[in-house]
């Protein structure tokens, strides 16, 4: 009976309450940030993606949640912008190319440098290891270890292994993000 009441209440809320959240998507170049945005926006994977120059902003609506998503370029010249676009967001999404093990150390260093910024303290982080469909890609446990995620103690942090190409774990990623938009406001 209570479960039925909760479902009815959720349906009623969806009719009248619209939720908004703001996310910043960062990570090294070619990790799949723009591809991720396109997959969650349209469900389409495009093999021929052009690297983001500077930043792109896109609004995506999923159910009663509108997501304002900042996709920031991952080339070295744009990394100084990451902090500015991460201030005040509901969550930071950090994309890692899990199949490019040569860049894991650089990716780890960039993530930890970003999270050391005082103005970003407490903002939840979702680390996504993309390209799990490729041979040799790190799984979640390996990503947590190689990215030294257990050392991050001042905020909630979560890690998923995904494939934008195969659309693996995209739904669970969105669920985590939407849940976070709710928990940050309560």
Curated annotation (Swiss-Prot):
Q: Which Gene Ontology BP terms does the record give?
A: anterograde axonal transport; cell division; chromosome segregation; protein transport
PANTHER family named among the record's database cross-references: ADP-RIBOSYLATION FACTOR-LIKE PROTEIN 8 (PTHR45732), ADP-RIBOSYLATION FACTOR-LIKE PROTEIN 8A (PTHR45732:SF4)
Family indicated by similarity: Belongs to the small GTPase superfamily. Arf family.
The answer on whether this UniProt entry bears the keyword Nucleotide-binding reads: yes
Q: Name one GO molecular function term.
A: GTPase activity
Q: Please state what the protein is called.
A: ADP-ribosylation factor-like protein 8A
Which residues make up the intramembrane stretches?
A: 1-19
Give a short account of what the protein does.
Answer: Plays a role in lysosomes motility. In neurons, mediates the anterograde axonal long-range transport of presynaptic lysosome-related vesicles required for presynaptic biogenesis and synaptic function. May play a role in chromosome segregation.
Question: Where is it chiefly localized?
Answer: membrane
What species was this sequence derived from?
Answer: Mus musculus (Mouse)
What InterPro entries does the annotation carry? Arl8a/8b, P-loop_NTPase, Small_GTP-bd, Small_GTPase_ARF/SAR
